[in-house]
């Protein structure tokens, strides 16, 4: 289950961090403005947010595997749509689909682990998952640079599709259905959490910290590479160092 969970969770940071070194090239190819590139980043996050709640509801009713495999398939297709984009609108569509697929697998990572592990082992597993989330931002800019040194920016999105395909295939072969035969009380009322002060407080604190990170990630490619003249290699090194420090 840990291997399956690792392969589920990596799509979320891969979809954010792998393509950052190519942002100026994408903007030039698609003749997109700085605002449009930032919008594409926001659309990815909106796709994630839209499917986190929906994915949980579907998983509770129809099973975890359907959401995992469906999310991986959506991510593959969306990555290829983005890779073949000829205009910013098609790129937006691909990014939204990537976010939707990543969001489905993101929520299923924690759902599956909660289904099969005790509280003590769950805490340990979540620490390991957090380690994976921290490592990806260190490696992704470098991997993106290596891909960009051989291909154009479209190759990065093909690589994303391959990662999602591997994730989907491994989960298809190894992941067993973990949905409990009897749902816990309140499982069918996900919106009830919005009335919990503790949940809302934790959500706001987490959102504030994540927002700061995502704002930096969103604006840094254009500021450093276009504004300050950093090369893709220099930008990849800066991102790797910053991610390493944050760990």
Per-segment meaning from a language model:
Residues 1-34, 216-221:
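Extracytoplasmic
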Residues 17, 45-53, 137-138, 243-247:
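Residue-level signature of mid-helix packing/kink "hotspots" within the transmembrane helices
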Residues 29-31, 63, 84-90, 101, ...:
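Helix-breaking motifs and short loop linkers at transmembrane-helix boundaries and internal kinks
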Residues 50-89:
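Conserved MFS/SLC helix-loop-helix module at the cytosolic interface between two early adjacent transmembrane helices
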Residues 89-95, 201-202:
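Short hydrophobic/alpha-helical segments at membrane-entry points of transmembrane helices
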Residues 90, 119-120, 124-173:
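Helix-loop-helix hairpin linking two adjacent transmembrane segments in secondary transporters
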Residues 94-133:
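Cytoplasmic helix-loop-helix junction between adjacent transmembrane helices
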Residues 178-202:
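Juxtamembrane intracellular "pre-TM" segments in multi-pass secondary transporters
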């Amino acid at each position: 289950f840990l291997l399956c969970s690792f392969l589920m969770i990596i799509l979320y940071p891969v979809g954010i961090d792998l393509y950052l070194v190519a942002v100026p090239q994408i903007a030039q190819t698609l003749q997109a403005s700085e605002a449009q590139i930032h919008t594409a980043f926001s659309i990815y996050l909106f796709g994630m947010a839209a499917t986190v709640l929906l994915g949980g509801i579907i998983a509770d009713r129809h099973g975890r595997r359907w959401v995992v495999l469906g999310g991986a398939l959506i991510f593959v297709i969306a990555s290829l749509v983005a890779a073949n984009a000829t205009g910013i609108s098609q790129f937006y569509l691909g990014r939204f689909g990537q976010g939707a697929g990543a969001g489905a697998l993101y929520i299923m990572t924690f759902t599956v682990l909660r289904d099969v592990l005790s509280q003590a082992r769950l805490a340990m597993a979540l620490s390991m998952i957090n380690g994976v989330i921290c490592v990806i931002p260190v490696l992704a800019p470098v991997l993106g640079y290596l891909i960009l040194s051989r291909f154009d920016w479209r190759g990065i999105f093909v690589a994303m599709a391959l990662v999602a395909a591997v994730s989907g295939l491994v989960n298809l072969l190894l992941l067993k259905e973990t949905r409990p035969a009897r749902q816990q009380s309140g499982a069918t009322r996900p919106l009830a959490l919005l009335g919990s002060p503790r949940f809302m407080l934790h959500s706001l604190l987490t959102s504030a910290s994540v927002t700061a990170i995502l704002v930096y990630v969103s604006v840094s490619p254009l500021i450093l590479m276009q504004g300050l003249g950093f090369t893709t290699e220099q930008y990849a090194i800066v991102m790797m160092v910053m991610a390493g420090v944050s760990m």
